[in-house]
Design a protein with these regions (language model features):
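Short, structured beta-strand-loop surface elements
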Residues: 53-117
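A structural signal for short, well-ordered beta-strand segments
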Residues: 40, 86-88, 123-125
């Protein structure tokens, strides 16, 4: 691996996810990849977001998804990226305690609208990298 790339632990990935609120969900629709910006909540190891019926909800709940957040500083050439891979699951009507807690959270969608469906990423796998600029 490049000496400027440092792998993040799962705990570091979760810390970064917990400190931010906007990311991108990647889904497949009509055999084409699509990426949507969403604001999200993190509950333990569960990433969840709100959406309306349509392409995003359908794509996110038909199988495997990827979710990504990042940050970079163009002046220092440093930054990081976290990727969450898992199975998109509609938890809107779920009865388990975590789903109920997520659905009752106060997440207000930036894009507005009712966004009455909640999607969580089940069986998540967390990976991340930090880019560290080393002079010379």
């Amino acid at each position: 691996m490049d000496e400027n790339l440092v792998e993040l632990s799962e705990d570091e990935c979760l810390d970064l996810l917990g400190a931010h609120s906007v990311g991108r969900i990647a889904v497949v629709s009509d055999r084409q990849p699509l990426i949507f910006p969403v604001n999200y909540v993190l509950d333990g190891r569960t990433v969840a977001f709100r959406t309306d019926p349509g392409t995003k909800l359908t794509g996110a709940t038909l199988g495997r998804v990827a979710f990504q957040i990042d940050s970079n500083d163009p002046l220092s050439w440093e930054g990081w990226s976290v990727l969450v891979k898992g199975i998109g699951t509609d938890i809107t009507d779920a009865r388990d305690a975590r789903s109920k807690r997520i659905v009752s959270s106060l997440l207000v969608p930036w894009a507005g609208g009712a966004k009455e469906h909640w999607v969580a990423i089940a069986s998540p796998v967390f990976t991340g990298r930090r880019i560290v600029h080393r002079p010379g």
